[in-house]
């Protein structure tokens, strides 16, 4: 099958607008968790989140007007705006602007979201109740449908190849990249714009995830300490928002136009737990099989893995994932670094896997493992380096990125340094 590489990245994250800004702040140990002030939270169990830094567009802040006209913004949910911004960045970074029929038809889009326009749906419900059906906007449906993130990107950039979307909870971003890679490998496209996007931070979302016992509620007075994967004092994840988009390209297509290459996508695994609607299987079997499949597809062994970007949500599932990883890597555990970047940016739900895949590609590029913040008191002993507190310089040629979601849906991506052959 054809080989697939990453030639462009774009990101809107709680650490900033832009891949390099977010990456630099991640490596220096910045933490995006804050008390929510944009709406009332005093009656909510979870009062904190990792919000995008909004501003005038300078110093890494996000200004939606830079990416979409205000009139158009009012027609869509923010998750679509974030996707548009990240896709614009990724395509510009890749230097890919298809203009011929051939190039447009061979370029597709696959962008997913875990929740989509949740707040917009709630608001429309109030409008219907209080003002009647005639006050519902004609843009209500197309502004909230999850596949419209891909649709809007496709329309803006005239990308006429596969136009697809996935919805697999917190595995969405990883599944989008994995599925898009397969479309290229199978010859259905030469280039794919792929990733995940999410704008979930609103009252009903915080209330709902807290009701599932998924969110941190014990660190409302000290938000930066709330997301603490693998730590004994963890009590749930901190919700985040944003988008991560990559440009995936068939290797020879990228080489022919002299594109820079971040990494090669060599493995993709997916599995189901068939266990519980929110909890992972306690033996980690689904996660293990998912990673094992990715290794098989990649044609590498566990001993080849240098860095793992863990799903690591700061929940009870952390130790289950760690156990599955230890089972996978066996005697190679002591040479592997594994960190959870959710400790800095929170859990971006459907965007998480895509943002973390980008971080994994950058870890390969720069030979550095980003840190796991707040790992003060590890809950279990392991030979794996969990990269506590401070980023670690080390050789990284192969990286594994894990994403696991509600409903027992699992995805693993394996990236490798591209060396020119």
Swiss-Prot record:
It catalyses: a fatty acyl-[ACP] + malonyl-[ACP] + H(+) = a 3-oxoacyl-[ACP] + holo-[ACP] + CO2; (9Z)-hexadecenoyl-[ACP] + malonyl-[ACP] + H(+) = 3-oxo-(11Z)-octadecenoyl-[ACP] + holo-[ACP] + CO2. Belongs to the thiolase-like superfamily. Beta-ketoacyl-ACP synthases family. PANTHER family: 3-OXOACYL-[ACYL-CARRIER-PROTEIN] SYNTHASE, MITOCHONDRIAL, POLYKETIDE SYNTHASE-RELATED. Keywords: Acyltransferase, Fatty acid biosynthesis, Fatty acid metabolism, Lipid biosynthesis, Lipid metabolism, Transferase. This is 3-oxoacyl-[acyl-carrier-protein] synthase 2. It comes from the Bacteria. Residues 1-417 form the Ketosynthase family 3 (KS3) domain. Homodimer. Pfam families: ketoacyl-synt, Ketoacyl-synt_C. GO terms for molecular function: 3-oxoacyl-[acyl-carrier-protein] synthase activity. Pathway: Lipid metabolism; fatty acid biosynthesis. SMART domains: PKS_KS (SM00825). Its EC number is 2.3.1.179.
């Amino acid at each position: 099958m054809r080989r697939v590489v990453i030639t462009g990245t774009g990101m809107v994250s709680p650490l900033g607008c832009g891949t390099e800004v977010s990456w630099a702040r991640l490596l220096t140990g910045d933490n995006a968790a804050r008390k929510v002030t944009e709406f009332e939270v005093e009656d909510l169990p979870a009062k904190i989140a990792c919000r995008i830094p909004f501003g005038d567009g300078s110093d890494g802040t996000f200004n939606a007007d830079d990416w979409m006209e205000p009139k158009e913004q009012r027609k869509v949910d923010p998750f679509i705006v974030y996707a548009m911004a990240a896709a614009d960045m990724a395509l510009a970074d890749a230097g890919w602007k298809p203009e011929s029929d051939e190039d447009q038809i061979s370029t597709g889009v696959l962008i997913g979201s875990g929740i989509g326009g949740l707040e917009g749906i709630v608001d429309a419900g109030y409008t219907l109740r209080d003002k009647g059906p005639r006050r519902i906007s004609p843009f209500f449906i197309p502004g909230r449908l999850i596949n419209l993130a891909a649709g809007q990107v496709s329309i803006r950039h005239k990308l006429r190849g596969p136009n697809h979307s996935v919805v697999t909870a917190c595995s969405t971003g990883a599944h989008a990249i994995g599925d898009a890679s397969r479309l290229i490998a199978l010859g259905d496209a030469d280039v794919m714009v792929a990733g995940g996007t999410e704008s979930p931070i609103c009252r009903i979302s915080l209330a709902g995830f807290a009701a599932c016992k998924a969110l941190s509620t014990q660190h409302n007075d000290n938000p930066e300490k709330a997301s603490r994967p693998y730590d004994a004092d963890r009590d749930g994840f901190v919700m985040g928002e944003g988008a991560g988009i990559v440009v995936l390209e068939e290797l020879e297509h990228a080489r022919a136009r002299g594109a820079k290459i971040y990494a090669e996508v060599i493995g993709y695994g997916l599995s189901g737990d068939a266990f519980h609607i929110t909890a992972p299987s306690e033996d980690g079997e689904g996660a293990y099989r998912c990673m094992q499949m990715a290794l098989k597809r990649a044609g590498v062994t566990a001993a080849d893995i240098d860095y793992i970007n863990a799903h690591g949500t700061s929940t009870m599932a952390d130790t289950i994932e760690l156990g599955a990883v230890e089972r996978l890597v066996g005697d190679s555990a002591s040479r592997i670094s594994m960190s959870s970047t959710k400790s800095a940016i929170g859990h971006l739900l459907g965007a998480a896997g895509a943002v973390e895949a980008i971080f994994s590609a950058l870890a390969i590029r720069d030979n550095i493992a980003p840190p796991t913040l707040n790992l003060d008191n590890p809950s279990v002993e392991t030979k794996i380096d969990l990269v506590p507190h401070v980023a670690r310089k080390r050789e990284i040629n192969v990286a594994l990125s894990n994403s696991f979601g509600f409903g027992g849906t699992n995805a693993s991506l394996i990236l490798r340094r591209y060396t020119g052959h």
